[in-house]
């Protein structure tokens, strides 16, 4: 329990330190630039990072810990492609909801069937892809095909590694042998808690906007 609490605290503390773009804001011009940017991008926002952690834990108990996260990665890549570089107002609220949903499912303590897990990963992953696509265009500007391919490869590789790696930590280091084990459920609760906080922020912002405040 102490190890889990310490790890969660370190993850929260480390997030700002990790939030530095590999290219220091320089424009992407080559495949390598896109690859580096893709590797660094999930670390720019703790909301994306926490969702990937939840994917890793949920996938762990489907019996397909290595391959189930690919559904999320495929949907995320589709979201990046579909975004067309546009920013959609509904994306950030849906990302908050995605954390609440997937974190809640993990905290529930029951293993998801493979079809349900894949549907959740894909359905929610699209919104993360739309967010990545919008930020890619907004921060990096127009990107060539080679840059975009490199970006998607880097983005997918690092997120797969994070998801699978965290799943291994939960099972092998924290000793979670089932979806109902405390480390797994607490991991889900942590993610759901972040989602709930973000949902409250979204609701607060909407309320202030409706009242003409701020």
Question: Which ranges hold each PLM region?
Answer:
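Cytoplasmic-side transmembrane-helix entry/capping segments in multi-pass membrane proteins
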Residues: 66-75, 91-98, 114-126
């Amino acid at each position: 329990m102490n190890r889990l609490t310490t790890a969660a605290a370190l993850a929260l503390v480390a997030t700002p330190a990790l939030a530095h773009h590999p290219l220091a804001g320089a424009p992407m011009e080559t495949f390598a630039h896109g690859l580096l940017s893709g590797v660094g991008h999930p670390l720019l926002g703790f909301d994306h990072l926490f969702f990937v952690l939840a994917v890793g834990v949920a996938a762990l108990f489907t019996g397909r810990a290595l391959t189930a996260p690919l559904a999320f990665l495929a949907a995320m890549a589709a979201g990046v492609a579909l975004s067309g570089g546009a920013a959609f107002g509904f994306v950030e609220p849906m990302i908050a909801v995605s954390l609440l949903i997937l974190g809640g499912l993990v905290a529930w303590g029951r293993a998801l069937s493979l079809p349900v897990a894949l549907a959740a990963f894909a359905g929610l992953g699209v919104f993360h892809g739309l967010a990545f696509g919008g930020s890619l265009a907004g921060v990096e500007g127009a990107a060539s095909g080679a840059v975009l391919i490199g970006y998607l490869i880097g983005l997918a590789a690092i997120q797969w590694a994070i998801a699978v790696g965290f799943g291994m930590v939960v099972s092998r280091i924290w000793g979670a042998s089932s979806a109902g084990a405390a480390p797994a459920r607490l991991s889900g609760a942590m993610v759901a808690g972040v989602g709930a906080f973000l949902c409250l922020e979204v609701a607060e912002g909407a309320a202030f906007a409706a009242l003409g405040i701020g």
